[in-house]
């Protein structure tokens, strides 16, 4: 049995030029596992705490030397000599050492980086691909699937400096036969969308997640531009390709109203649910994330009752990858899907528990990046190793996004005939 002989933390940069945490876990046989913690822009209020230094003279207060110090000090001392393959024991030990509800003492960024680095070291020690090790940890050895990519090709909201209120407009290549075919389809649509926007005299600069970020007349205008790009790429909208939204509605919710400032419109919960329902009737939208504010559970129930039978309703800020909150949502019939983000909860073990709870209740689980990413591609292995069926990792440019797609291509090649891609069957309706 290999043992942990050293743990090192360091401050590195994420895709927005902000500091984040990287950890190395070293084993007594020379193996090293390394992992980086991502960081979000539109965040749920109940996410685990990302520990920042607050020193305004350094990185405008966003340094992570405190979190790094926690890795190099108390976390290292705690885990030296431990078995890296006992993921639950490692994660529970760090959670207990932290002792807070939201990992505020050590920092979710510190705990997560070590948690993932340990998993990578353990996978190497057992001569397993990371996705296979994750499947074993998940209690589903050998059960894999390639995820349908939800490609964010127009950015708005907190992810772009434009007038578009909805944060993400995505395409899903549900008609593809394989993941690699689906990735090609999405890439072709992305390039055709650039041409469509250019022809309209619109900006083709990209946002945080690599999608285009033009000023558009309305959210419906964004959907129309994508529909045109799909057609120009030679695909049939609604059959080959479907659409998805991430409203990130908490970002434009105030005093009980949903304010679409880009369109000069304001709605109550029922009105905004009807607005979204109307979009699903005019476009083949099969997934909507954070359609209402994270605290507006009554509004979420209205939306679920209106379109939940036909449309995947994903809780991101709503559930924050937290089993306690998810359990309550399941009991109340709120949404029908959970977005899975490692750093919302802060450990691999708790992430797997959230996926398992969702699946047991008939909810789908969508594996997701954050807007602040690195070259770390662990979420690709997580999607395959849990057979989640869906992944959100941005657009088809920026290496922080493409690194995940490229890792999925490698995994598909390794799995060969076992690389099952289910397409439309991964979604409701």
From Swiss-Prot:
Gene3D superfamilies: Enolase-like C-terminal domain, Enolase-like, N-terminal domain. Its EC number is 4.2.1.11. Binds a second Mg(2+) ion via substrate during catalysis. InterPro entries: Enolase (IPR000941), Enolase-like_C_sf (IPR036849), Enolase-like_N (IPR029017), Enolase_C (IPR020810), Enolase_CS (IPR020809), Enolase_N (IPR020811). Pathway: Carbohydrate degradation; glycolysis; pyruvate from D-glyceraldehyde 3-phosphate: step 4/5. Mg(2+) binds at residues 246, 289, 316. Belongs to the enolase family. It catalyses: (2R)-2-phosphoglycerate = phosphoenolpyruvate + H2O. The keyword Magnesium applies. The keyword Kinase does not apply. This is Enolase. Its cofactor is Mg(2+). The active site is at residues 209, 341. Catalyzes the reversible conversion of 2-phosphoglycerate (2-PG) into phosphoenolpyruvate (PEP). It is essential for the degradation of carbohydrates via glycolysis. GO terms for cellular component: cell surface; extracellular region; phosphopyruvate hydratase complex. PROSITE patterns: ENOLASE (PS00164). (2R)-2-phosphoglycerate binds at residues 167, 341, 370-371, 392. It is found in: Cytoplasm; Secreted; Cell surface. It comes from Pseudomonas putida (strain W619). Keywords: Cytoplasm, Glycolysis, Lyase, Magnesium, Metal-binding, Secreted. Component of the RNA degradosome, a multiprotein complex involved in RNA processing and mRNA degradation.
């Amino acid at each position: 049995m290999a043992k942990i002989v050293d743990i090192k933390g360091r401050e590195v940069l994420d895709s927005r030029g902000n500091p984040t945490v990287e950890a190395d876990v070293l084993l007594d046989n020379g193996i090293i596992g390394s992992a980086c913690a991502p960081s979000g822009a539109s965040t749920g209020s109940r996410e685990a705490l990302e520990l920042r230094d607050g020193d305004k003279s350094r990185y405008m207060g966003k340094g992570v030397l405190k979190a790094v110090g926690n890795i190099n000090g108390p976390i290292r001392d705690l885990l030296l000599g431990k078995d890296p393959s006992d993921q639950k024991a490692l994660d529970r030990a760090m959670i207990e050492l932290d002792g807070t509800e939201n990992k505020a003492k050590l920092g979710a960024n510190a705990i997560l980086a070590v948690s993932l680095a340990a998993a990578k070291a353990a996978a190497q020690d057992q001569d397993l691909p990371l996705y296979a090790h994750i499947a074993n940890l998940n209690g589903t050895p050998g059960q894999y699937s390639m995820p349908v990519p939800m490609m964010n090709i127009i950015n708005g909201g907190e992810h772009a400096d434009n007038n578009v209120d909805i944060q993400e407009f995505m395409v899903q290549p549900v008609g593809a036969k394989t993941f690699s075919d689906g990735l090609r389809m999405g890439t072709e649509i992305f390039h055709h969308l650039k041409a469509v926007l250019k022809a309209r005299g619109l900006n083709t600069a990209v946002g945080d997640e690599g999608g285009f970020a033009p000023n558009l007349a309305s959210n419906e205008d964004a959907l129309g531009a994508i529909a045109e790009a799909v057609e120009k790429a030679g695909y049939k909208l609604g059959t080959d390709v479907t659409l998805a939204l991430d409203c990130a509605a908490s970002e434009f919710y105030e005093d009980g109203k949903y304010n679409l400032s880009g369109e000069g419109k304001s709605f109550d919960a029922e009105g905004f649910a009807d607005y979204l329902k109307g979009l699903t009737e005019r476009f083949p939208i099969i997934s909507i994330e954070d359609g209402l504010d994270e605290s507006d559970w009554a509004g979420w129930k209205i939306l679920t009752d209106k379109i939940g039978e036909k449309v995947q309703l994903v809780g991101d800020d709503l559930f924050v990858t937290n089993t306690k909150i998810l359990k309550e949502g399941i009991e109340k019939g709120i949404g029908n899907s959970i977005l899975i983000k490692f750093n919302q909860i802060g450990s691999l073990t708790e992430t797997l528990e959230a996926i398992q709870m969702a699946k047991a209740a008939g909810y789908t689980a969508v594996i997701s990046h954050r807007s602040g990413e690195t070259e770390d591609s662990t979420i690709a292995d997580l999607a395959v190793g849990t057979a989640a069926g869906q992944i959100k990792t941005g657009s088809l440019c920026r290496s922080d996004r493409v690194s995940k797609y490229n890792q999925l291509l490698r995994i598909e090649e390794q799995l060969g005939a076992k690389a099952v891609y289910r397409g439309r069957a991964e979604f409701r309706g």
